Amino acid sequence: MALPVTLSGRSLAPGFQDTHLFAPRRVALMADPAIAASAVLARNLAAGGFRGALHAVGAPWAGMDHAPDLAALAEAPHLAVLSLPPDGIGPAMDALAARGCFAAVVPGPAPGLAAHCARTGVRAMGEHSFGICIPPLGLNASLSHMAPRPGRLALLCQSSALARAVIDWAEGEAVGFSLIAGIGTNADYGFAGGLDWLARDAPTGAVLLDLRRIKNRRMFISAARATARTRPVVAQRPGHAGRDVADAVMGAALRRAGVLRVQGLEEFLSAAETLGRVKPSLRPGAEGARGDRIAVVSNGLGPGQMAADAALRGGARLAVIPPEARTLLDLALPEGWSGENPLALPAGQGHRLAEAASLLSALAEVDSVVAIHAPAPDEDPEVAAAALAAAAASTGKGGRAAPVLAAWLGQYSAGAQRRALAERGVAVFTTPEAAVQGALHLAQHRRNRAAAAELPSAEVLEVTPDRARVSALFAAARAEGRVQLDEAESLAVLSAYGVPVIPHRAAATLDEAVEAAAELGWPVVLKVLSDALPAKTEVGAVALDLRDAAALRDAAAAMEAGLAAARPGLRPRGWMVQRQAPPGRELRLRLGDDPMFGPWIGFGRGGTAAPIEADESHDLPPLNRALALAMIGRTRVSRLLDGWRDHLPVSREGLAEALVGLSQFAVDFPEVEAAVVNPLRARPEGMEVLDARITLRPPGETGFLAIPPYPASLARPFTTKDGRGVVVRPIRPEDAEGVAAFVRRVPAEDVRYRFFNPLRELPPAQLARLTQIDYDREMAFAAIAGDSIAGTARLVLDGQEGGEFALLIDAAWKRGGLARHMMGRLMDWARGRGLRRIHGQVLAENAGMLRFVQAIGFATRRSEDPEILEASLEL
């Protein structure tokens, strides 16, 4: 069964195939000569050297065959480029659909394009698309001012001006492209479809995204994660940086997808330089590490120190060279080298840069190497550059050594060497700081990959939440016509999810408040209990440190008088009495809702000054402890949590558990619109929520998680016919080593039957594809027997109400019913998703599998390949 180990291409319209958009063999230009862009498109198409059939349909254009209309073409085009007046787009798409062409690019304005696509089934990039360039095919159906060269970089963009700027920069840096696609306004075919293609496009080594508008958050994150598992993905979103929570939530979504976010064109191009040339290290253990240990070597002390300073400013670490490595360096390098990181070579020894970089790259203590060359008399920079290019190429083989980045200084004299290094695939920069930024991009990419591999379950709390209590509180509020919970109700909800709250009592009358204070113990805090007071301190509705009944009654009288003046007509629900909390660090937790990415979690500095401090990190639910701890670490206030002078440290683990509780709450109750926990007061002895406010959505509305949780509820035990037990559960990223060992253990013939290839060792990228899956678009079950895997079963949605299956069982576990059970689990999952059929490919010589699938109801037939049979089952 040759199930692709990447995701199948989504085909959202009958007749549409993404190969027709991204690998067309027949292209038609339908262009109005009165539109200025038409001449640019025609010129680029004719000059591109397209390896397929190219036709001008309607108006003739030089350099391509002409047909008066689509009916005159011998075969339907795979792709049409429509440079027509707005009122001509709809009729043109009708004609395309009638002729059997279902992929189009629309460079100009096209009001109603989404409706045209829905009506005709034609998928279109646009409106205002830059066009599409596929340099390996010689296709340039774009508004570019120059032809991009072939290479490993892909660009999905919304801005035509930015696309031209990147193409121009790339030519100067000898960077080539596998694909450039202009999404335009994202009216129909958008980023998710393009990323789906790039996830399995072998020529693409790295992806650049120019983001402005995303239509479907879940599809985008799903596709971005699929792509980022196997190659770096870099994104920039201009016009929003640092301005609002929405921008921070966008950053969180990209991080969870494994995408590196950058700010501005300069950093965008810097990331392209690094990730377009450098393959991130695949050395064992590197994936989960910070990846920020940088070694610097230069032919002069000053530039090396500048690089070291830049690394430390960027939050990286200078790699520590172990004693045994120092001995090797002493033997290899000339006398007079600095002996520490940064390594400075003696004068006139610039040609030894390559040797030093190779030695450093091989060290397990080094994640990346920055090699710096400054102009020097009596040195041949071309020799040094050639040697470094060879060294960088050798370290890149196999992905086990740390990558080498170069800074070749000298604006006037070093241009030729930089060009030579770039031509040979070395990431080369003009300053030490820029090279270090490239190393930081590699480190952040590795951390993002680790974050994307985190798959929190729908159940991650140590205690079981009291969901029934929360449901009852919500029902009571809605019965009163309220969507706003009061403070007592909000604290009760948090307590139900294991978040510590301050001891408190709600009182309907002042006498009850005095009794509650006596029960809690003096001193106490008194608050007005109301769902209509989001900021009680601003209207004097809070009194602190009340030490007896008289003080409490006086405070209550003052509050009533103040509220009567400030908020006439307000009817409080009563009083909230809390034990006076000891001093501590005030923090804030938030749950909000983003129009694009749905529910989000925030953590940062609390208290009344929290909005001014603007010290908050954000992430998307579901969270686990690792993600929550990372959230805490991204704030400035986190540095104070570890202790400072007379402030004792606070437990980050306890705070992480509170964040996980808030995340679990968001997963369980999508009808919640917002929650604010402020302040949460943290001390060395523990923490307590002092105030909280929860808001429900209007009746009938519900939220939608951008990232689905790990489906832990699908785990089931199974006992084979001979009494052996396994647990069949959805596969997880941490199963990668187990899957690798499983494939090595299974007989070679069975592996060949499964992958149509005599594999014995799965490469890391393929292991990632097999174990880091999107449960919205595929399911893979693993049968766990102790600490090993006994079998795997997989089903990938094909976009046409079906899915493609694959099955592999360890020989020691065959004939016990495990294969039938796992296929049954796939069928149940498929039915639950509303699929109508499942299908797979079986080698004709695989008699055992053919008998098995026929026995469980599959029909088999010959495919176009005589060596392969198609097996299918209607559900």
Give the ranges of each region predicted by the language model.
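Catalytic-core regions of core metabolic enzymes
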Residues: 2-691, 695
